[in-house]
């Protein structure tokens, strides 16, 4: 089944999504991280990155917010690049836990591996795997360069957010040392946790995340810079991780209602990948009870459903002028 969608249609639907959702008052900012609690709750932006490099944007698409857990996708890509798909599967895994993103119980139940790079335990383990082992500065450079390659522009560390995260990350400290207990962390636990905390504190925009999603959708080639960031054979591995764990214990509901693999973060960002078609991102700080942006979810669902797109419907989608 073939489906053609015009760029003007996408522009119209993105604008409609913004207008439909911007007045929504549901949710509240993350309050357990002081920096996030004080972000303007009315900020809202959407960006779609087409595979020709064109971005369609509306609202606060260029506001820099904390990438938070969306960074897990980026570092998963980095270790897939450095180690290959099979080694990542062996050292971390790719299973959904069915539990909240910061679950300690999940480690106790599945102590032979941290489950997936897209939950906190697996993400901390992923940071520990980044090469060169033992060199925090070079590992950090690799993490930032990888995000830069994916987004097409450099993220900026939000120092105030980093300090807030570091002062309140008690649960993640427990996770790091529990992983050490089970030999599932591959570098110094404190260093690995700090790298994870820093990467979550990087400032990005909805437009940047849409380009990163577009890079995944485009078989590893950044649509804007045209750089081959990773091998195309990794795309289904990355997309399957996002589909099964992107919304943690609610990933099934998300896929059922939206039809697009997407990753969420408590900074208010959501990044969705529709392979072979486009990348999409939306940002708004107020979160639902599971830590997912209320407006971003509604906006992306609106776009997907209005355009009649779904990763599972088997349609070959062509975007025309």
From Swiss-Prot:
Keywords: Hydrolase. GO terms for molecular function: glutaminase activity. It catalyses: L-glutamine + H2O = L-glutamate + NH4(+). The keyword Hydrolase applies. Its EC number is 3.5.1.2. GO terms for biological process: glutamate biosynthetic process; glutamine catabolic process. Substrate binds at residues 69, 120, 165, 172, 196, 248, 266. Pfam families: Glutaminase. It comes from the Bacteria. The keyword Hydrolase applies. PANTHER family: GLUTAMINASE, GLUTAMINASE 1. Belongs to the glutaminase family. Homotetramer. This is Glutaminase. It comes from Bacteroides fragilis (strain ATCC 25285 / DSM 2151 / CCUG 4856 / JCM 11019 / LMG 10263 / NCTC 9343 / Onslow / VPI 2553 / EN-2).
